Design a protein with these regions (language model features):
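Conserved glycine-centered short motifs in functionally critical loops
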Residues: 157-159, 163-227, 234-237
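Short beta-strand segments
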Residues: 14-16, 40-42, 232-234, 257-260
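Basic/aromatic-rich interaction segments and small domains that mediate binding to polyanionic partners
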Residues: 240-260
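A generic structural signal for residues embedded in beta-strands
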Residues: 33, 227-229
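Intrinsically disordered, low-complexity linker and terminal regions at domain boundaries
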Residues: 259-305
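Short, basic/aromatic beta-hairpin or loop at an interaction surface
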Residues: 1-15, 194-207, 253-255
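Mixed-charge, low-complexity intrinsically disordered segments
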Residues: 237-238, 272
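Acidic-enriched and Gly/Ser
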Residues: 1-188
Length: 305
């Protein structure tokens, strides 16, 4: 077992482990640590604890020091400097006539590097832009191309649910999502209904997937023939996944039919087989394209791994 603390460098960012060393550090404090891109100012989100050795990437770096008042002030000044750096970079992009969208400027704590995050369709030759920026800032410059999901994570926003975006509030990593999840949850397969503000399949499709898989496994499909606890046979007309209730058109003795509602546990039926929703070709193509784009972009490009 290894003693560590967990540190984040941005809202909803990936959590990195560091050795607390001689310091006693509590959750909510700030620390100065050495990272792959230099000395950084981080927020402690996991207090001291022991984790299994295989969960720690070696060599495990130790905390340089808990953040001082001077460190806090320096970090605040860096955030102000980033606003000016953003404006300057926008001007330089326009000057060089580059087809790229600047998303964020970020200083490392020690000012050893300025990172500029951007989105673009395809590859961009920004070598001359880097030289121009280096002559202005007199420090190392890194331009990092990110995807539209990273853009949403950085900028934030409000989802169709009316709540702040999942990726910008609590998700440290993007989760793989697929059309299958929308089908499993019986959601509308209209691409505009299940796409987030980033234009990709909504990350929240993953949130309830395991629950829906378990609940759906206990239900028949619409159209299945079932036997009820009171010895009646009938055809399933609708199901309520969360309530675990099933409406059945039962056959009565006098050749009449009647719609009755039962608990899923009151029915006997064959093991469920997947019945996919019928989709028009246009919607199916759009959904498949969204799924391909999500897989292509993969993990976040904001993190320094």
């Amino acid at each position: 077992m290894t003693k560590v603390i967990g540190v984040r460098f941005r809202q909803a960012g990936k959590i990195y482990f560091f050795a607390p060393g001689k310091y006693h550090i509590e959750e909510g404090e700030h620390v100065i640590v050495e990272t792959a891109r230099g000395v950084e100012y981080g927020h402690v989100v996991l207090s001291e604890r022991e984790v299994e050795d295989d969960k720690v990437i070696q060599p495990l770096k130790a905390v340089i020091r808990p953040a001082t008042v001077e460190d806090d002030e320096r970090e605040a000044k860096n955030r102000e400097k980033e606003k000016e750096a953003y404006k300057i970079c926008l001007e330089k992009i326009a000057k060089h006539k580059l087809d790229m969208k600047l998303i964020q400027a970020e200083y490392t704590f020690d000012n050893n590097k300025v990172l500029f995050y951007f989105t673009a369709d395809g590859r961009i030759d920004f070598r001359e832009l880097v030289k121009d920026l280096a002559s202005v800032f007199k420090t190392r410059i890194e331009l990092r191309q990110i995807g539209v999901r990273d853009e949403a994570k950085i900028r934030g926003g409000i989802g169709v649910c009316g709540r702040p975006l999942c990726c910008a509030t609590y998700m440290p990593e993007f989760v793989p999502v697929s059309i299958k999840m929308a089908k499993e949850q019986n959601l509308s397969l209209n691409p505009t209904k299940i796409s987030g503000v980033c234009g990709r399949l909504m990350c929240c499709l993953k949130n309830e997937q395991d629950t829906y898989e378990e609940l759906n496994s206990k239900l028949p499909n619409v159209g299945d023939i079932v036997t009820t606890f009171d010895k009646l046979k009938g055809e399933v007309s609708s199901v309520s996944v969360l309530r675990q209730r099933v409406k059945v058109i039962v056959n009565l003795d006098n050749d009449e039919k009647e719609v009755r509602e039962y608990a899923a546990s009151e029915l006997r039926f064959k093991p469920k087989k997947r019945v996919d929703k019928a989709l028009d070709k246009k919607s199916l193509k759009e959904l498949e394209e969204l799924e391909k784009l999500e897989k292509k972009e993969g993990k976040s490009h904001i993190n320094d791994d």
